């Protein structure tokens, strides 16, 4: 095996063409075996193996710096930079993350997980090199739809006039997660169809030199192209056309479905565990399709992905012009939603909580200053969802619940989630953001209302005395479970579902203060700036009530085990009940 002998990129630089082909086959087999066991971003990585071998053959990493956009396609890079053990030894499969990680290797220049950032990051490295009088090559590898992001275009605009060594490898596999959209990608297709000679060339228009490689899975052609641009004295783009999912028939036939995949049987491609449908996503898809049929002015927006609700290709086709994929451009999607709402349409833009972070300014300025009644659906909002530091979904409450004019709601059941969605789309007074539950009540413990226009009205789920548990969104169930624990100890706790994250039910809080001396807030997010601190601030001005805020501290967590993290911060029902008993002694 070649991989067992590779400890750094220098180990492959003396390889012959045949050895490189054998190495690529070995890497591809290792990737397929590993992903079949633990899952991961298999499609992008299978398509970039030859380019990674060529990059590490030509360039001298880590002296020459290679920045991976998104970095979900870094598995082959990790194989060649001292981490092959994590791809060939099943016992060590989990030793490395799925993204570049500066804690793992000096060959990983940044911790990256969001799209369209590599050109900007690398441009800073290039400028710093020039200021220091360095001579290393700076390479930004970008693809998988990331070129449609505004930051990528802003970066192109800057590097076009750097006048110094800067190499962009554009990995063109004609895919984002789903299909690419937009005029830019039509022009990229023209470049592919003309062997890179089409007159409309974005990169040349931005002031960069341009080199085209028709077969981006031909290692020798790539080595020739990279050798040609190595040590260049001006910015250059090497446009390589790759085959996403190369070498695995299932991934080649269904690049969207195999962008990222759960563990699977290699022979059949069937997942090893049956996928458990997300009831919230399924109900949301049904709602979107139903609303589109009834309301010709309804539009669902996505940004290069289907927003965590799993709109199938057939669903997207059925929506027709009522579905708009803006590419990986969340900021644009939010502003477009504002324009749609101002123009009389009824838009929903849905994406993951982690990606909504990119849209703060548009949400504040373009939407909320203008009071545009657009609807935004945040998914993946839980410490129990993605555990990689680049994709955490529990900062959104602190970020968005404090924007004036934005009504942010956290429903707690499928029935309530759809009721809130329906109200949000039908009303035309407020910008509304909805935190789609990750988990929640199987059956709603109280009657679900249909009108949420009387803002900030919380729901008393059960009545008690002395102890009040306020469970936010996903943690509404946790509040009820903690109340059950306390009931077994003879304490009847009151449980409240606030529903609204952007404001307080001050009348209810004042009323509850009369017969409750201990109040606990539980939220699936960070405490600082969160809902619980709003409650603490409210009672802090009055005195006489002790408030304890439960949630996560303001820090980044990486590759954690959710249950362990929850226990660390006492986010389990037995721990919460024990804390209450201790406080009441």
Locate predicted features.
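N-terminal amphipathic, basic-rich helices that act as targeting or association modules
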Residues: 1-79, 215
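Glycine/charged-rich beta-loop-alpha catalytic/anionic-binding loops adjacent to active sites
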Residues: 29-36, 95-111, 133-139, 313-327, ...
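A short, small-residue-rich loop immediately preceding and capping a beta-strand
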Residues: 38-40, 64-67, 111, 132-149, ...
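Cofactor-binding active-site loop characterized by glycine-rich and histidine/acidic residues
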Residues: 41-162, 298, 312-313, 453
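A glycine-rich helix N-cap at a beta->alpha junction
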Residues: 86-96, 161-173, 368-380
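Glycine-rich ThDP/TPP pyrophosphate-binding loop and its adjacent helix/strand module
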Residues: 108-264, 270-273, 277, 284, ...
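Non-catalytic terminal/interface segments that mediate subunit docking, oligomerization
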Residues: 248-372, 471-473
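Peripheral docking tails and interdomain loops at the edges
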Residues: 263-267, 271-274, 385-387, 407, ...
